[in-house]
Amino acid sequence: SDDNLLCYGTHTEIEGDVTTFGAVGDGKTDCSKAINSAIASLPSEGGVVVIPEGDFVLDAPIVINKHNVTFKGLNPGMRSNIDVNGINELLGPGGGSKLVARNAEAAIKVETGVKGVKIMNLMVSGGTEAKNIGIHFAGTSDDGMLSNIIGINLHTGVKIEQAKNMQIINCWVCELPNSMVLIGGENINIKNCQLGAQPTGITCKAQGVNKLSFVNNQVYPDGRENLVLDGCNNCIVEGNNFKSYYNGILVLSGNDNRVNKNIFWLTGALQNQMLDHGDDFGIINVKGNNNMFVSNSLSCEWAYTDVVAVNATQGTGNVFKNCFIDNLESYRVFLVNAGTEVSNCVSSDKVSIVE
């Protein structure tokens, strides 16, 4: 069988099973040394490490320092705190392969310069409080993949630094301050994920990333911002469903990005929906050049009057085309500079141009 395929169900003996190295999934025993021994036993060309069903507690990070390591559970089990009655049932053995970062600053740390690491079919949790990092790619990795990962009760679910050619697919990372943080790198693909954060954090933040593809994701409340692209170029944001209680759903700075066919939904009409942004910040805020926004839908439940939905007052060549906005009560639905094109979105009297 292909070891890279999803592997569900029970098993008797699988090569690389961490319990053969002394790991005990009882929700109490520190398993970091045993699991790192399993990785150390792999040949230099890599191999497979399997986490069976159970709660494997970590007081130190699992460190992946070899190329072509596949680190996988059998299935990620229950996902949400609200799927079960009581936190003890979520953390109890059975119902999935779980890593609990009790005292580890990261449950899994992928060392700098490692290629071909695949992590899949796991739940990664901070335990009963939101602390630590779930999975941390510490620098200059290549051809990594995260698939079918649940991250919950962490400070940051996934942190990726300087990665190239990274795939993050079919992951559920919610009920924590920050779902995903990307720093540097290029050709990173986040697809078919469900992400949700808390107002002390940002759901997904990418800083200095080139060619990020953020496609077909479901982004729930309650992050301060849903997606922040800070100094990112040549990115594609397409087919996502963004839902938030706060303005600043998408905050973008950079050049030559494409934002197409997304739904942006500001809901709840909360009195604190501005946070500290101000009523001219917009649920979409753009700074940069030659960014294209085509065929997006914006639904705005404002608690205030004459609020800006889209702010593009810095940069040139930014284009908003064929976008639908349901709330046209404000006189300045768009607040843009003269270098921004707005076509087939709203009537011209709803576009306020700043000098």
Stretches with model-predicted labels:
Residues 2-18, 343, 347-355:
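Glycine-rich, low-complexity segments
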Residues 12, 39-45, 64-65, 112-113, ...:
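Flexible, charged surface loops at secondary-structure boundaries
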Residues 18-52:
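Acidic Gly/Asp/Thr-rich repetitive segments characteristic of extracellular carbohydrate-active
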Residues 36, 43-89, 97-104, 124:
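N-terminal extracellular ligand-recognition/capping segment immediately after the signal peptide
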Residues 47, 59-61, 80-84, 101-107, ...:
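Short glycine/acidic-rich loop motifs that flank beta-strands on beta-rich extracellular proteins
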Residues 64-67, 115, 140-143, 163-167, ...:
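Short "repeat-start/strand-capping" segments in structured domains, especially the N-termini
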Residues 70-75, 91-95, 107-154, 169, ...:
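Parallel beta-helix/beta-solenoid
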Residues 122, 149, 171, 193, ...:
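Consensus "Asn ladder" position of solenoid repeat domains
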